[in-house]
């Protein structure tokens, strides 16, 4: 959309409320905020008559409020939402084959430990995620290679000095506000990263194995 002028309301999708909406081809993807609603796929080939085709639920205590899709591949986050719910579900990033949108098929899941993944960017191959990770305070930056979506591979990570307490770093903030990566966004060889109360960082990712603040 180049301009919002003359925009007309042509249809409405009654859903459980969304944390993110994404469109790929004729499919609209809705990531819901609250369980048990997880991710809904809607056929919008006729924009005046959108048709829900399936919903992927999540158990109590978890949500999947973010979704991205490209070329028959959908990725959704799994993140703790509240205190009650099965711990074995696990936080992370779930990867689906959606070549048949009516029957999404989970092909893998990247488990992060802790609360899971909050937000992310996806360019069709690499996912730039904000997960919790063992040994770290808060959420960090992580880059996953999904060229083989059944076997995601971590290729790089970055964090604010002090987050890696498991590696011997000293957590220096006395206000106890955890440094949490909120959302990495890629533009060329740069990753623009919001970090909640700790500001924003620009990372050089020309070498994805060694993200570097600039």
Regions found by a protein language model. Give the residues of each.
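Feature marking well-ordered beta-strand scaffolds used for ligand recognition
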Residues: 1-214
